[in-house]
Amino acid sequence: MIDDESVPWIEKYRPKKLEDITQSQNLLDLFKNSTKKGEMTHFLFYGPPGTGKTSAILAMGREIFKEHFQNRVIEFNASDDRGINAVREKITNEAKKYVAEIKLEDGTIIPSYKIIILDEADSMTDEAQDALRVIIEQYSTATRFCFICNYITKITDAIKSRCSSVYFKKLSDECMVEKLNDISLKESMELPKNILHTIIDVSNGDMRKAIMLLQNFKYTYNFKKNLTKKLKDMTLLELKTILFMTKKSSITSTISEEDVYEISASITLDKAKGIIDDTIDCNNIVEVSNLSKKIIAMGFPIDNILTQLNKCILESNKLDVNQISKIIIYSGDILLKMKECGNEYIQLLNYLAYVNRVSKHFD
């Protein structure tokens, strides 16, 4: 039996039913109608990460197949096998398997098809997607496909034309706070609303990331809650945690927003604002370069730093609307280069140098 403590919270608290999914009612009604009739079409789910795309199709599978769910729903992560060979071998072998209609004792009919889920489908090559088009047509009676992606523009027209496209919008802060508060109470954590809002802020609206961060946050929460415990009553793990935490400059018994930023490997907005102010005040590229080196030495992931810097840019009173627009657009290119394995120091220097130039009306 798997220890409950070892189960990732994103799986432990994944919605099992359609009504538990936080999305628009029209979307849920569409899914419920499909499950009631058992006449599911091919789907293409797209939208920001952590908005319930995978949870929705899994919940639909449970509604349609009941106790036969495990045998009728097959998941593939397209980012692992993104080429045509994976399509020809793994996916084709599953798609061509025929399954029989089953009638349960209560009269419920389990339809004679299965569901293949292709997560991160936008990472598949165009060649692999073209091969899938043939498979969809050939085995549509035995298999229903559900493509899941963040960017629909990376899906070929051949796939899009054969699927019902459904957009999953970003979850509201209120919905995320309610969900995180529910989870924290179930895990015996009483967190104030400002902490939950900070978790949402550093997660950028990604519910999956927020729940993972909340799970990591539990160790800090338990440590601070037990600061008043006597040493003889502490477990070995708690003693090791104290040894690690006492290496820091200061420890308080209260949970703070700084704890959230530290656990998420993000800089605070105040620190980000200071970096933007220092960048604007730089007089030459040498000063910008030295500032970039100091930021790199902080040890935070650069994409996290850039995200926080952009938030401060949007609220800056030292830049006009035109300057802010230029910087935000330019930062998109920087983040793309980061995802394509660009050098962190060079891309950070590129970003800060551009902010400096724009602030002085040189660009």
Curated annotation (Swiss-Prot):
User: What job does this protein perform?
Assistant: Part of the RFC clamp loader complex which loads the PCNA sliding clamp onto DNA.
User: What family does this chain come from, according to its entry?
Assistant: Belongs to the activator 1 small subunits family. RfcS subfamily.
Q: What taxonomic ancestry is recorded?
A: Viruses, Varidnaviria, Bamfordvirae, Nucleocytoviricota, Megaviricetes
GO MF annotation terms: ATP binding; ATP hydrolysis activity; DNA binding; DNA clamp loader activity
Keywords, A to Z, come to: ATP-binding, DNA replication, Nucleotide-binding
Q: Which organism is it from?
A: Acanthamoeba polyphaga mimivirus (APMV)
Name under which the protein is recorded: Putative replication factor C small subunit L510
Please provide the Gene Ontology terms (biological process) for this protein.
Answer: DNA repair; DNA-templated DNA replication
Amino-acid positions noted as binding ATP in the UniProt annotation, renumbered to this chain? 47-54
SUPFAM superfamilies, alphabetized: P-loop containing nucleoside triphosphate hydrolases, post-AAA+ oligomerization domain-like
